[in-house]
């Protein structure tokens, strides 16, 4: 039996399952890979957006990564949401120490609803300390413009072998998660970078045709409201009538 080399994902937790470590594990498993994880932050969120964060202490993040890297030794590491400078420092220390074959970075600067996920201090440290270690950056355009706003920096990073892959459909929740996780699986299978990127794009194209089954209470109320309007619009125009129906 062929042994599957695990893929380490270092990122936050999304309680809706649409992004974060949940989306990484689901995508990696769906494509036949095996995911191990280190959690950087826990979000309180639903379909309306993020209500709160709990950032895992840096020493605990470090302990998670060290335990996995020292024992299981994954050759591919995917890095996602990092909100604090001290967390970024322990991630960089571990990546520098263990030097995995591929480091895939999917920046999480804003949520799909536009919530800020990190400060400028973290962004600055990412530019000059994390990017030089990365094999590929998978980003939405607006995040790429922030992370790689310095043309000289981009040339230096690309000179070190880093590639940048930009994704459209910027408002699709968890898009960079799923793409970068798929990319990790294909690289883990021994595919060349160009082939792995193309296969990950094909995977995402199929994913985008699928409608999410996740529906919050606000969507349910909206659908009920539209149904009532269709049924009674010729009879009632008072908004209070429709509010009573809900």
Cite the ranges covered by each PLM segment.
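Conserved beta-alpha-beta core of the PfkB/ribokinase-like small-molecule kinase fold
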Residues: 76-153
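Phosphate-handling active-site elements
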Residues: 31-36, 186-200
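Short, small-residue alpha-helix embedded
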Residues: 22, 171-193
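Glycine-rich phosphate/adenosyl-contacting loop at the front of the ribokinase-like
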Residues: 1-43, 241-246
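Conserved phosphate-donor
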Residues: 135-173, 195, 201-217
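Glycine-rich, highly charged phosphate/nucleotide-binding loops
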Residues: 52-70
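Charged C-terminal helix
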Residues: 4, 52, 195-246
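A short acidic, helix-capping loop that chelates divalent metal ions and anchors anionic groups
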Residues: 43-51, 111-116
């Amino acid at each position: 039996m062929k042994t599957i080399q695990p893929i380490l994902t270092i990122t936050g937790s999304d309680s809706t399952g649409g992004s974060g470590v949940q989306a990484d594990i689901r995508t990696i498993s769906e494509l036949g890979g095996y995911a191990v994880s280190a959690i950087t932050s826990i979000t309180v969120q639903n379909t309306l957006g993020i209500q709160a964060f709990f950032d895992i202490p840096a020493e605990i993040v470090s302990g998670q990564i060290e335990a996995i890297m020292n024992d299981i030794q994954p050759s591919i590491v995917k890095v996602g949401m990092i909100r604090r400078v001290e967390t970024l420092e322990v991630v960089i220390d571990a990546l520098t120490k263990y030097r995995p074959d591929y480091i895939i970075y999917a920046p999480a600067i804003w949520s799909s609803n536009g919530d800020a996920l990190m400060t400028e201090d973290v962004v600055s440290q990412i530019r000059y300390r994390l990017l030089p270690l990365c094999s590929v950056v998978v980003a939405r355009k607006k995040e790429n413009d922030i992370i790689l706003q310095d043309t000289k920096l981009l040339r230096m990073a690309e000179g070190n072998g880093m590639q940048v892959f930009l994704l459209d459909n910027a408002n699709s929740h968890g898009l960079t998660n799923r793409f970068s996780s798929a990319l990790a699986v294909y690289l883990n299978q021994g595919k060349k970078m160009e082939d792995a990127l193309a296969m990950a794009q094909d995977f995402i194209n199929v994913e985008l045709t699928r409608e999410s089954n996740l529906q919050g209470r606000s969507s349910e109320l909206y659908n009920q409201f539209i149904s009532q309007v269709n049924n009674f619009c010729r009879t009632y125009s008072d908004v209070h009538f429709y509010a009573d129906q809900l």
